[in-house]
Amino acid sequence: MASCFHPSAMATSHREEDSIILFSASNSPDEFSSASSSFSSSPLPTPNRYSLTVTNLSYTINHTPILNSVSLAAESSKILAVVGPSGTGKSTLLKIISGRVNHKALDPSSAVLMNNRKITDYNQLRRLCGFVPQDDDLLPLLTVKETLMYSAKFSLRDSTAKEREERVESLLSDLGLVLVQDSFVGEGDEEDRGVSGGERKRVSIAVEMIRDPPILLLDEPTSGLDSRNSLQVVELLATMAKSKQRTVLFSIHQPSYRILDYISDYLILSRGSVIHLGSLEHLEDSIAKLGFQIPEQLNPIEFAMEIVESLRTFKPNSVAVVESSSMWPENNENDGIISKKEAFRVLDVTEISYLCSRFCKIIYRTKQLFLARTMQAVVAGLGLGSVYTRLKRDEEGVAERLGLFAFSLSFLLSSTVEALPIYLRERRVLMKESSRGSYRISSYMIANTIAFVPFLFVVSLLFSIPVYWIVGLNPSIQAFSFFVLCVWLIILMASSLVLFLSAVSPDFISGNSLICTVLGAFFLFSGYFIPKEKIPKPWMFMYYVSLYRYPLESMVVNEYWSMREECFSSGNMGCLMTGEDVLKERGLDKDTRWINVGIMLAFFVFYRILCWGILLRKASKSTH
């Protein structure tokens, strides 16, 4: 199996001086030879100018080889395009180089070098490499400028507000986003159109370029774009590589003729192995030596994809291999940048404040969460009030109050499901941002709590005020205040549960099914349908973990404790049922409601801690 390898920097004005450089997949790093002497006079790279070398990179998953002895060299100021059929390992290669794949799964002989220095801590790659995934994981309800400003706040901690503003303005100008800077990013669908696909891709690139990484990796940046937008994106990358002296690698499936003009070198993969690495001219030479003629309607890359099996078997007479470190003499100025480790940050109040600000904007702009949720609470409160208007203080009224409490709980707990798609959408952004060190997941959870708790308190008030006074529940202000507290805690518990289940659910359908199943089980074992004494022992644990049980008991105690001497049913023998009898029948007393408040708070915190743990684990394995 042979591969063509020729860094474009070796090209001279005389074609006969060019050499087709090939290497076998079995070659070791020791077999690399020096480049021509023309590189000895090359100036040292300036700080943050990096050359990248990958040698013998092999990667296997579940005994299935994904990459087989892949070697490459990439220079700053130029673009290296990774080309190959679908499933050939292009995305995996970029993720490994960017430090987004567990390096323990790599072959021990595999190595990634920057400026002739081997990277031993693959976490450094996340800091040195910007990575733009194929999917544009952005928050649709932020404007283009807001998206970049928040990225700058998270990434440029040591910069002043003015410096961050200038950095954002510069990127908006460089990437041609000035005219859409105040437009919402959107998702590209009919309901939330936002900016165009090409503009959204440029926003994704800008987000990565905020911190000015020396190496930029992009996974299929032209995927889903028309030819015009694809050309604009590649042209932008080429301009940025030259003007900023950045090393750019991206995968592409089938580049057009016009795109080829902006790419310096090509790495062609087939079945995880290198088929060609070098310039377009050298690929044409290899194709010609095989006896093929490139059709006029196809460019060399497209034709190479058609004859990839022939290229796999092509073995040249002579082999010479170049290590990229020979292009760039070892640069001591960058040593500190490569070896520097980020200091551990304690609880960052500024980080949390930025996240809180972003959450508040998203809540306000999310119609189904802000407007629909508030209107839903008001309508439900008025609706229940109209059904249970002025309940009587008799035995029938006692049963109706219990039904009101149970239905209210069912409504309040199930109404939080509508936040599931929002959490799932944010989770993708969270994985990307937290995995690259923008902020910690603990900060995200704290900010989420701070932003949502006041909003959910407003929702609880909007529900409680109409239903409480129209129904005619316990008229004391203390009882009303506790009812509002109870409703608030119910919603908080439910939001934590949904947040936790969104962390373990792969998509909306499975998440919605899981939430409905869990809530249904909690309601069944709340003690409303089946008394505690009748619950089978194997299911008794559900009675204690049910989110319905504790608020239901608290509402009953709140309603009848101050009226425990009041008679709700009388007969010839006198009073047959007092408020105290109602409580005794359910095994409740005054202390129950405050104990239950503590338990509800514990559930609220518990589910958020579980969510934090799951997200933390997922972020550590994230490839975004």
Swiss-Prot record:
Q: Which domain of life is it from?
A: Eukaryota
Q: Any transmembrane segments, and where?
A: 369-389, 402-422, 450-470, 480-500, 511-531, 595-615
Q: Which InterPro entries match?
A: AAA+_ATPase (IPR003593), ABC2_TM (IPR013525), ABC_transporter-like_ATP-bd (IPR003439), ABC_transporter-like_CS (IPR017871), ABCG_dom (IPR043926), ABCG_transporters (IPR050352), P-loop_NTPase (IPR027417)
What Pfam families does the record point to?
ABC2_membrane, ABC2_membrane_7, ABC_tran
ABC transmembrane type-2 domain spans which residues?
Answer: 350-560
Q: Where does ATP bind?
A: 84-91
**Which keywords label this protein?**
ATP-binding, Membrane, Nucleotide-binding, Transmembrane, Transmembrane helix, Transport
What compartments host this protein?
A: Membrane
Fetch the SMART domains from UniProt. AAA
What kind of membrane protein is this, topologically? Multi-pass membrane protein
Q: Where is the ABC transporter domain?
A: 52-296
Q: Name one GO cellular component term.
A: membrane
GO terms of molecular function: ABC-type transporter activity; ATP binding; ATP hydrolysis activity
Kindly report the protein's main subcellular placement as a broad class. membrane
What the record says about family reads:
Belongs to the ABC transporter superfamily. ABCG family. Eye pigment precursor importer (TC 3.A.1.204) subfamily.
Name of the protein:
ABC transporter G family member 23
What is the species listed in this Swiss-Prot or TrEMBL entry? Answer: Arabidopsis thaliana
